[in-house]
Amino acid sequence: VPPSSLLTMEGANIIFNLSASNELIGKHAYLRSLICQQSARCMAGYVYASSGFGESSTDLVFAGNGIIAENGNLLAESPRFTMEEQLVISEIDIETLQNDRQVNTSFMYGTSGLPKEKAQVVDFQVRISDGFSLTRPVDPHPFTPSGEALKERCEEIFHIQVAGLAKRLVHAHAQTAVVG
């Protein structure tokens, strides 16, 4: 089990992975996919930073990958192979991640069987300066789809309710019912 999986099952919302992974042909696409997949499996934010130009040698080349993913979505990525320092910025919606974990029974079940480790909790305060603006849009209604997705969601809710009511009526041997 990857350490990031264990950490998220202990309650971590964001994984910070500091790496010294060298470059190989085709490795970057695999790495990007792996980070997005792991952030989805963990229902977490995943911040990856790898060694850069200054750490390269005659034997190994480091591209200086910086990747930020959230629950399977690539949010931001730094340019590779630069000789300059890189700064990658994005927001990770912790409240949405925590909600997703609460409603996902597989995630909650997975956490119940873990031996309780002594996880270190780090409290911190974020100070927002004047003129601060987000780098990505934040949906004010993240749990309510729109357009065609809303129609599909409502139909799904309706069919779930109908199936539940039908099962109850069969179980109660009801010959008639008034629904209103």
Regions found by a protein language model. Give the residues of each.
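Domain-wide signal for the mature, well-folded portions of proteins, strongly enriched
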Residues: 1-3, 77, 97-100, 167-172
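CN hydrolase (nitrilase-like) catalytic-core segments centered on the catalytic cysteine
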Residues: 2-89
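Catalytic cores of large soluble enzymes that bind and process phosphate-bearing ligands
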Residues: 4, 27-30, 146-157, 169
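Short acidic (Asp/Glu) and glycine-rich catalytic loops that position anionic groups and cofactors
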Residues: 15-18, 137-141, 173-174
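A sequence-level detector of short, solvent-exposed, charge-rich linear segments
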Residues: 31-35, 65, 97, 109, ...
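Generic helix-packing signal
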Residues: 70, 94, 165-168
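Catalytic P-loop NTP-binding/switch module of NTPases
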Residues: 86-151, 155, 159-160
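A phosphate-binding catalytic loop at a beta-strand-loop-alpha-helix junction
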Residues: 157, 161-180
